[in-house]
Structure formats: structure tokens, C-alpha cells
Amino acid sequence: MVNAILDGRRMTTRAAAHDELTHALALPAHYGRNLDALWDALGEVEGRVTLTHTDALLEALGAYGAELIKTLYDAARDNPGLEFGVADETQAD
């Protein structure tokens, strides 16, 4: 079971975003490092995932960042063992 905090400030490129996801969620070595692969991997994750500094993520990645966040929300909706939320940036540090 994970209790992961994803830091949007570290997600400055697509590669950096997938590095953060891989590390924080202990994703398997075969994780494909794209949003479809993230969706598949999140089906196996149980626990709580919190994203901080969404503003930095969205500034750096734009539409891809928004799709990443949507993927996390959608996966949590479909996986009863996964909770996803966004932290108030004033309380994240």
C-alpha cells in the first residue's frame, strides 16, 4: 500500500513527470512512461496519492499536465483501492 506525495515542481518535462510517478508509486520496471501505461499501472496501486504544486505542473506541461491529473482522478474513480487528491499548496511544504 502506498502513501505517495507527487511534487508538481519536479514534473518539469514529460520524462521528469514519469520519473516522479515511477519513484513515488514504485511502478514496475516495465512501466511504459506514458499516460496509457500510467492508467494501466494505477489499476494495480492501492493507497493514497496526493499531488502538490499543481500550478507548477500545469505551467510546465500544459495540456499534458492536465491529462496526467485527469488520468490520476479517473484511475482513482475506477480502482476502489486507490485514493487521489490535490493538496492545498499553502499546506504542502
What are these regions (language model features)?
Residues 1-93:
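Positively charged, polar, low-complexity stretches
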